[in-house]
Amino acid sequence: MKSIGPFLPLFFLLLSCTVQDPLGTAAAPENTSWNKSIPLAGNAWVLDDLLASSSLIQENGLANWSEAGHSIGVFFHLSGTGKMQMALRARVQSGESVLNYTFGGQTGEISLHNTDWAIIPIGAFDVSLPGYQRLELQGKTRTGPYFAEVEAVLLGGAAAKGEAHYVKDEFYWGRRGPSVHLWYPQADRIAQVEWFYNEITVPEGQDVLGSYFMANGFNEGYFGFQVNSDTERRILFSVWSPYQTDNPNEIPENQKIKLLKKGQDVYTGEFGNEGSGGQSYLRYPWRAGVTYRFLLRGHPAAGNTTDYTAWFYAPEAGQWRLIASWRRPKTNTYLAGLYSFLENFIPETGATSRYARYSNQWARDTGGQWHELTRAHFTADDTARKGNRLDYTGGMQNGAFFLRNCGFFNERTEIDTDFERPATGKQPVIDLNGLP
């Protein structure tokens, strides 16, 4: 978790201050009481170049902003409507800058020439609908090296007095956006689940950079596919070590995940930061609009260990591919805690929505019987539960489960909601003994 930094106390000092500031060209009522302070460090993105956010949106807010072509979007969610005053806490390094702003279809200009932090009124607006709001800033002219440094957007008036949701802390996680999950409770009532089968379809246009569409999750790991860059995609299978640490170098030898075998062209190694363990991935150019199949096996092995093996089926290849087989020490179990998730792992793309369909889930017991999993329990992570981000949803559509997150949409599914899809009866037809 990143530190929220020493600047936050400044935000809270502003929440009830009275402002009469002559520096802004847009008018705000005298004696405005600023009820909310939205830190740009957790709530702003460079809309025209999302990856530029990593250099322009810093721990203290917007900085190093020199290109006029960049459009800065600041997002926040309001439950109230009515009149709202808006201002920036901002400064310039030198000279004078003029910024263009857009909010709710209203546009205008702001002038800055203060080199100390000051409150720059933008103006008064009518908020007609509750939900996510977006303030957009663009640089127009500047005589100094940068357009402005902006620490926060301040809100006052009737619309700002109600409940507001925005990223207040843990900016790294808030910028990544909320992670959402589908748990399959029917599997918990099946004795000794050895195999878990799932299918995922990512519609065209939803394969957003930074997405991890996780198909086959279990208590000790997860298996799915990712969009890692504009040119690279991966099929990822990871198993956590029983030793609790975020640093794989700290894991004792007798608690390390051991590789048993791996598929052709599969990378294997260790991972950290969100637990630690064994990681394997295949670089594979999977495509949006195509349904891919995932198969996982988990069963006890000798010496209080458990073996986990993952296979991936791409219809364009027409065959199952081995990703890897891992042995986990100090573990004696079959598969349990079966679930799927959708997460964004790149903070710079946390303002872009992504969606996937999860369909035809099955679990196979040690007696050889397949069980269709037609029920799912929807949950979300702390970013969602704390109300830092509300752009998450999931459920059942057109016969399949789905997950969607990020992008500041207003549709939202209540956490801990149960869903049921129609049974397909399409039991997996797989020669389990013939798998690579």
Can you describe what each PLM-predicted range is?
Residues 2-10:
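Sec-dependent signal peptide recognition
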Residues 19:
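Short, conserved catalytic or interaction motifs in soluble domains
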Residues 15-16:
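C-terminal motif of bacterial Sec signal peptides marking the signal peptidase cleavage site
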Residues 23-285, 293-436:
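Extracytoplasmic
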